[in-house]
């Protein structure tokens, strides 16, 4: 464990198109090797595709997908007297955001479509409708927490 003080969280600047901090966080999550311009093109291209296919406001569909993926509880390992228990704990807002975007991107990577724009758009639309890889991951995590509810009294 580091003994220095915890690094402060720098506030994220909203993106230029939607003026939304969550969109900025998603673009940063898409970005590889510092190529933010490419990441932005992928995200906004996916938004255009969502608009064409659903006829709805892409930011609204993205927020709906985000809310559907967001985990409420997760399990954390807690060692008590020689045995390790999977203890269900509530997820903080910051961790909810990072888990949601991480799960969304790993689900996007596993999709069969050819281009990154199509994969991202497909995952956003699927998640908004309650299906897709990221939703499955969230359900698995919450099911695990539900199965271990008996150990909730070990929460710290």
Swiss-Prot record:
Keyword annotations: Ribonucleoprotein, Ribosomal protein, RNA-binding, rRNA-binding, tRNA-binding
GO cellular component: small ribosomal subunit
GO molecular-function term, one example from the UniProt record: tRNA binding
InterPro entries: Ribosomal_uS7, Ribosomal_uS7_bac/org-type, Ribosomal_uS7_CS, Ribosomal_uS7_dom, Ribosomal_uS7_dom_sf
Domain of life: Bacteria
Matches recorded under CDD domains: uS7_Bacteria (cd14869)
Gene Ontology biological process terms from the UniProt entry: translation
KW Transmembrane (keyword) present: no
PANTHER family in the record: RIBOSOMAL PROTEIN S7
Family membership noted in the UniProt record: Belongs to the universal ribosomal protein uS7 family.
Subunit structure: Part of the 30S ribosomal subunit. Contacts proteins S9 and S11.
HAMAP family, per the entry: Ribosomal_uS7_B
Role played: One of the primary rRNA binding proteins, it binds directly to 16S rRNA where it nucleates assembly of the head domain of the 30S subunit. Is located at the subunit interface close to the decoding center, probably blocks exit of the E-site tRNA.
NCBIfam families per UniProt: rpsG_bact
This protein's name: Small ribosomal subunit protein uS7
Species annotation: Deinococcus deserti (strain DSM 17065 / CIP 109153 / LMG 22923 / VCD115)
């Amino acid at each position: 464990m580091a003994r220095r003080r915890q690094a402060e969280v720098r506030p994220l600047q909203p993106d230029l198109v939607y003026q939304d901090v969550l969109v900025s966080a998603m673009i940063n999550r898409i970005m590889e090797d510092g190529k933010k311009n490419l990441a932005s093109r992928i995200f906004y291209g996916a938004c255009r595709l969502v608009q064409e296919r659903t006829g709805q406001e892409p930011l609204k569909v993205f927020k709906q997908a985000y809310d559907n993926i967001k985990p409420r509880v997760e399990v954390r390992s807690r060692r008590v007297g020689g045995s390790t228990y999977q203890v269900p704990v509530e997820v903080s807002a910051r961790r909810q955001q990072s888990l949601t975007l991480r799960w969304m991107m790993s689900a996007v990577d596993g999709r069969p479509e050819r281009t990154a724009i199509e994969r991202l758009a497909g995952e956003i639309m699927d998640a908004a409708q309650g299906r897709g890889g990221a939703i499955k991951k969230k359900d698995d995590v919450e099911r695990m927490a539900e199965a271990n509810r008996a150990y909730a009294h070990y929460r710290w």
